[in-house]
């Protein structure tokens, strides 16, 4: 009853939902203009998401949404580009009276054109339209509908890919190119309108996290925290959770992508909450780590502060022109120094024999002992996808104004950490030295993740939920 009461009281205390924000129709048109300018001449073909099998909620594919703003299923987009001119058409599903009993009537062509500013036709006219364009000699640029592919089958094809393969087979000599690299470059920098959408998604996430901080106590179930967050996101005008929430307590805090959320939280646990609200299709991604009792133990505080220092180091160097590599190094060096200080490694630069030794050729850090405690990337872009552009966690590149991204260092001391290591003389010597520290800090997983915007001078912190040790403990003391 106290848990239910806390949810009700917190909902009464929340401000009224702000007026809905949207991406203007003119911005979608500008995006299409930018894509057209990059290809100069050709035919762009993109397929939207399909109607879900069963009662699942439909979510439009990000690339399709980015270009059209159209949110109905079973649509296709064709844009013919010639020097100095372009013509775009949406092909939308036909009205089926019986299907409408289940899913409602889709908008007709006139309504689609009014909503999107794009000429609209029935999807049944798509094959003939493409046939007529195949004879123009223009190259075809395709946008693959990744989200409908079966990732477990390397030879699987999405609906769009299968259609285009058949189409190309029927038109020998047709040039087909991948438009995704071009679109990716356009999606990397976020416009002011996109930044506003992301700020709203982030604010919703921060509000939900504050609710959970105030309600958290030993004996709660992980799924109760997840339910509180989902409720907060929806009550305040969000799309809901932008991805499956991670609520990992105790040993689950050391599993990066744990999401069963079915464990009862113990008194001495830390809880990693990696969550994000969606708003208008845009995804936030924020992580906070809480002490179940409301106060971090001395060992938990020690690990937490290393992670926080690593995040601060990365945020400090993030500005226009900063290389992704130097940004990653700033955080990694803090983590390496910290875990060495705790006795979890033999030294800052100490190495080991990993089971993934082949990866060390291109990424030498993967062979350092500190990598055992943070094997994931430092951050990623956010936007229409929770892992959006830019991709600063690997490869080369520099930050530029308009980049919106996460910084999410972590340290995870799994009780099974030493069991995954190959039995080599080097590893045996390391294990003998670090085992006492691993036993001391085991089941402590700490991750702190925040969202940032690159401005003209640096990185603006967007996700302003309590994160310093004292701030987290003070927020948790504000019981509902």
Task: Set out the residue ranges of the language-model regions.
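Active-site neighborhoods and metal-handling regions in enzymes and metal-associated proteins
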Residues: 3, 20-480
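Bacterial N-terminal signal peptides
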Residues: 6-17
């Amino acid at each position: 009853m106290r848990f239910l009461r806390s949810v009700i009281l917190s909902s009464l205390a929340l401000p009224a939902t702000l007026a809905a924000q949207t991406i203007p129709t003119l911005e979608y048109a500008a995006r299409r203009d930018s894509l057209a300018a990059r290809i100069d001449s050709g035919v762009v073909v993109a397929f939207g998401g399909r109607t879900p099998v069963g009662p699942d909620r439909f979510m439009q594919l990000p690339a399709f949404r980015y270009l059209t703003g159209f949110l109905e299923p079973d649509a296709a987009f064709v844009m013919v580009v010639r020097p100095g001119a372009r013509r775009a058409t949406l092909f939308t599903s036909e009205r089926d009276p019986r299907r409408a009993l289940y899913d409602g009537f889709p908008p007709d062509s006139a309504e689609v054109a009014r909503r999107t500013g794009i000429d609209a036709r029935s999807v049944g006219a798509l094959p003939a339209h493409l046939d007529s364009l195949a004879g123009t000699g223009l190259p075809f640029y395709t946008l693959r509908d990744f989200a409908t592919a079966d990732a477990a089958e390397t030879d699987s094809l999405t609906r769009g890919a299968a259609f285009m393969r058949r189409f190309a087979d029927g038109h020998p000599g047709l040039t087909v190119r991948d438009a995704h690299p071009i679109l990716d470059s356009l999606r990397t920098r976020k416009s002011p309108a996109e930044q506003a959408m992301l700020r709203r998604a982030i604010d919703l996430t921060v509000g939900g996290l504050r609710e959970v901080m105030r309600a958290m106590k030993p004996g709660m179930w992980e799924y109760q925290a997840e339910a509180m967050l989902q409720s907060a996101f929806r009550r305040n005008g969000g799309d809901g959770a932008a991805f499956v929430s991670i609520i990992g307590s105790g040993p689950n805090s050391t599993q990066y992508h744990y999401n069963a959320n079915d464990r009862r939280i113990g008194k001495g646990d830390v809880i990693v909450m990696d969550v994000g609200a969606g708003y208008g299709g845009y995804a936030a991604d924020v992580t906070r780590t809480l002490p179940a009792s409301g106060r971090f133990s001395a060992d938990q505080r020690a690990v937490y502060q290393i992670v926080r220092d690593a995040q601060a180091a990365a945020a400090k160097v993030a500005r226009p022109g900063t290389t992704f590599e130097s940004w990653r190094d700033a955080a990694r060096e803090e983590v390496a120094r910290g875990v060495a200080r705790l006795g979890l490694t033999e030294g800052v630069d100490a190495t080991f024999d990993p089971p993934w030794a082949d990866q060390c050729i291109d990424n030498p850090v993967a062979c350092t002992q500190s990598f055992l405690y943070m094997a994931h990337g430092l951050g990623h872009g956010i936007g229409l996808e929770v892992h959006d552009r830019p991709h600063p966690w690997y490869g080369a590149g520099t930050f530029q104004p308009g980049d919106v991204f996460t910084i999410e260092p972590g340290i995870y001391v799994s009780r099974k950490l030493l069991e995954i290591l190959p039995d080599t003389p080097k590893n045996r010597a390391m294990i003998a030295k670090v085992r006492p520290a691993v036993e001391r800090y085991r089941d402590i997983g700490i991750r702190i993740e925040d969202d940032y915007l690159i401005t003209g001078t640096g990185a603006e912190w967007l996700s302003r939920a309590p994160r310093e040790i004292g701030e987290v403990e003070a927020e948790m003391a504000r019981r509902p």
